[in-house]
Amino acid sequence: MSNKSVLLIAGEPSGDLLGAHLAQSLKSLEPNLKLAGMGGKRMREAGVEVFINADKLAVVGLLEILRQFRDIRHAMQTLKRYFKKTPPDLVVFIDYPGFNLHMAKQAKKAGIKVLYYVSPQIWAWRYGRIKKIKKYVDHMAVLFDFEEKLYQKENVPVSFVGHPLANAPTPSLSRNEICKQFNLDLDKPIVALFPGSREQEINKLLPMMVQAGKLIQTQIPTVQFILPLALNLALDKIRPFLSPEIKVIQNDISHVLAIAHAAVAASGTVTLEIALQQVPLVIIYKVAPLTFWLGKKLIRLSFIGLCNLVSPEPVAVELLQQDATPQAIADEVFQLLNNHNYRQSIIGKLGHLRPQLDRGNAAQNVAKVVHNLIFS
């Protein structure tokens, strides 16, 4: 029925997953819709013709961006040529604002409609980017209700589609079955480790997590550790940092969270995923000192963890830069596991998150917005 085409642009593993789910929903709605774009393995598996591999583009921090500048510039030039030679009916930019807001301008110059899925965190820093959004974006699809109110106030067309993680399916296996599959004992404490999906995060954070694990073992000898490896990472990348007691599972976060008693996580979307499953967690992060200094000057927020930002009150301790030490991590995990009142208080706070984020199937909601934009 349709010979329409949509370009999906994702620059990080989290965006690749969102793009894959959106692609599946779009194919259900319009089977003949042509989908192409920039992304990773997930989008490719979902039937998107990925002509730019985003694996090398998932960087954070000023210095890290400079190191990958050649790859980023090449991706920008490739997209710019695509906009001119094969203009799609719509471009869906998914998160990744530094790159995507620039390319939204190029898409608009080429006369292409633009949908932006996952708002830049203008409520946290660089609110001035709202001017670019007004100028180059036809419609915003946002994950949080307070973002919808913000854009409505600025007269930007917007849809609150809900957060995909709030409506994620629960594992079909029981906790006992999952433990048996992973060769773990549910009667002994299980701590999940989430060192991030970017190489520089792994290099900085995983060694600390491993050292913290050894300290935790001295206090709780029966503790077990499990690490769900991000899809874009090869085991060889993290093997040098691992210790024998850490069990590595290939990309199975939902099953890991179903059995975890506590978690240690790099700041990012995963903190919200953990929190929504009501697993008590500690958030850690380290970047280059210059990057952190600039961030403190520019960002006007008390917290960096997404689960803390969307909650009325803090739900996880954050250990950043020099405060992120193996001993500090171990001390907080010990409290989360062994201090019953503290643990129950955290779990109670985590239970309030899901209702405020759930609007049904987010990917289907975005697919309807896409359909309206290209067929209106």
UniProtKB/Swiss-Prot annotation:
Entry EC number(s): 2.4.1.182
Recorded GO MF terms: lipid-A-disaccharide synthase activity; phospholipid binding
Enzyme class: transferase
Pfam families: LpxB
UniProt catalytic activity: a lipid X + a UDP-2-N,3-O-bis[(3R)-3-hydroxyacyl]-alpha-D-glucosamine = a lipid A disaccharide + UDP + H(+)
Keywords annotated in UniProt: Glycosyltransferase, Lipid A biosynthesis, Lipid biosynthesis, Lipid metabolism, Transferase
GO CC term (a single one): membrane
InterPro entries in alphabetical order: Glyco_trans_19
Pathway where this protein functions: Bacterial outer membrane biogenesis; LPS lipid A biosynthesis
The keyword Nucleus belongs to this UniProt entry's keyword annotation: no
One example of a Gene Ontology biological process annotation: lipid A biosynthetic process
UniProt record similarity statement: Belongs to the LpxB family.
NCBIfam families, A to Z: lpxB
Function: Condensation of UDP-2,3-diacylglucosamine and 2,3-diacylglucosamine-1-phosphate to form lipid A disaccharide, a precursor of lipid A, a phosphorylated glycolipid that anchors the lipopolysaccharide to the outer membrane of the cell.
Protein name as annotated: Lipid-A-disaccharide synthase
Lineage: Bacteria, Pseudomonadati, Pseudomonadota, Gammaproteobacteria, Legionellales
Gene that produces this protein: lpxB
